[in-house]
């Protein structure tokens, strides 16, 4: 039996919360006086794992409206502009995978620079496909 729209929306909302948590904890680590390599690796690897998890399947037809934990904030354009969605998804995956590689080096300045690149891919998707309400 296929998953219900409500479940798909809940799962993607949950995944984005885990992503947000790891972006926040990595930023706090980068901004701290003493960068912790192990914590950076944990956060970066989690971000990369989410990027590579196949979340696109959670945006099935019928989930452009509705409620998971809260009403979905995805714009209808996400479901009609496949080319642009593909571009932002590929960019996010690429930069998230690079973040995991850079985090493994323990170079705080390099992690900070790559973190910024990941953040830009998040912003690109939010600007085009996330409602502000």
Curated annotation (Swiss-Prot):
GO biological process, one term: electron transport chain
Entry keyword annotation includes Transport: yes
One Pfam family named in its UniProt record: Cytochrom_C_2
Post-translational modification: Binds 1 heme c group covalently per subunit.
Protein name: Cytochrome c'
GO MF term set: electron transfer activity; heme binding; iron ion binding
InterPro entries linked to this entry: Cyt_c/b562, Cyt_c_II, Cyt_c_prime, Cyt_c_prime_subgr
Functional description taken from the UniProt entry: Cytochrome c' is the most widely occurring bacterial c-type cytochrome. Cytochromes c' are high-spin proteins and the heme has no sixth ligand. Their exact function is not known.
PROSITE patterns xrefs: CYTCII
Binding site for heme c: 12, 72, 122, 125-126
């Amino acid at each position: 039996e296929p998953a219900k729209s409500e479940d798909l929306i809940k799962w993607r909302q949950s995944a984005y919360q885990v992503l947000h948590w790891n972006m926040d904890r990595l930023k706090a680590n980068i901004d701290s006086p003493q960068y912790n390599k192990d914590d950076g690796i944990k956060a970066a690897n989690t971000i990369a794992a989410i990027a590579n998890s196949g979340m696109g399947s959670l945006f099935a037809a019928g989930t452009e409206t509705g409620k998971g934990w809260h009403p979905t904030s995805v714009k209808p354009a996400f479901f009609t502009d496949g080319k642009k969605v593909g571009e932002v998804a590929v960019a996010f995956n690429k930069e998230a995978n690079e973040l995991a590689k850079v985090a493994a080096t323990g170079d705080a300045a390099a992690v900070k620079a790559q973190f910024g690149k990941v953040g830009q891919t998040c912003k690109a998707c939010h600007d085009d496909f996330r409602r502000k309400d």
